[in-house]
Amino acid sequence: MRIKELDGLRGIAVLAVILYHYFPWLPITGSAYGWLGVDLFFVLSGFLITSILLGLREQEHYFTIFYSRRILRIFPPYYLALAVYILVCAVLGRLGGFGLWSPYLFYYTSLYVHDPMQVHGVMQYPPLAVVHGLGVLWSLSVEEIYYTVWAPIVRFMKEKMFAATLIAMIIAAPSLRWMWYYPGHLEYFTFYCRMDALAYGSAVALLIHHRRVSPVAWAGRDRFFDWLAVAVIPIAAVFFLIAGGSPDNHYVETVGVLLADLSFALVIYAAIRRSGGNQLWVRLLRARWLRSVGMVSYSLYLFHFPLLVVSHDLVGKLHLPRRVDALGVDLLGLVLSFAVAYGLWYGMESRILRWKDRKVPSPAHA
């Protein structure tokens, strides 16, 4: 069963990322925190994937069903975005060497930092350089690696063991971020340092799984998680107000991200429990426009940054005043991004998803 409130959270996540990438020049304090939208995506993905795997756990064709459905969901838009962007770069004579874009082709960008500009903290790239436009794909590498390693763990490990694995991941990732901290985002892009967000989402899936089995016994535990959310979310908000929104901060990358991911997990848990409820925040998550953005969030995330780079190149040829140029780049990028995302959804994604559900049925929609 599709949970509408989670579509709303996906919409918030992708809008936060777009705000961060498109409008850093606006005097809007919240735009500095938009990078946390990626963490919200990670927690949501951890929940979704683990929920699916728990539903498939006793299926004879567990791996075939899971991986085939994931491939049909993830690969078509991903490789279309990759192909179109590389083609544009080739036409403009800015393709670069195979080593620059091959990590995106094979999903291993988050296993190591392949771009020396990231290692040295230089995040300004030449317009339409391949690495720049494809930079956002690192997060999909993190998720794909998690899908690959987590499915066997859920299938073969006893529940206590994979719960212990989640705890180990939640402890290990911030520890690695602390030890590996470098202003060039070395710790920001790697799977090993970001796996805790996915683990938080997986923990929520495990809690929901047990809650459905014995809802009466979980009444007291639900109250505990409500009080935990009341405590943690304000602490996280105060922390970020004091520490600032930049990820180029040792304490933000460790303590801040930990608090943010835990807050997102608690919000997701509460949203699932209260799905369909009349609380104001729950109704806001069900807003039709926000769920619509959440529906196309995958393609919107894939294309928004490459199209921003393309818009920068096109508008830059007009030699407009700086502020007008920045606004023109952002508006053109936004229009193109939403047009492409909705076009892909209705023209390709939704059709593939319907075909997937017919050909590779699953107890839980993937």
Enumerate the language-model features and the residues they cover:
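Alpha-helical transmembrane segments in multi-pass integral membrane proteins
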Residues: M1-L6, I12-W35, I49-I65, L87-G99, ...
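Short alpha-helical catalytic segment bearing the HExxH-like zincin motif
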Residues: D7, F66, L137-S141, Y147, ...
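His/acidic/aromatic-lined binding-pocket segments of jelly-roll/cupin-type domains
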Residues: D39-F42, D196
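Alpha-helical transmembrane segments of multi-pass membrane proteins
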Residues: S68-A81, V154
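Hydrophobic alpha-helical segments with transmembrane-like composition
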Residues: I74, V119-A172, T190-L198, A205-H209
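Hydrophobic alpha-helical transmembrane segments that constitute the membrane-spanning cores
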Residues: L80-V88
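Short helix- or helix-capping micro-motifs
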Residues: P103-Y108
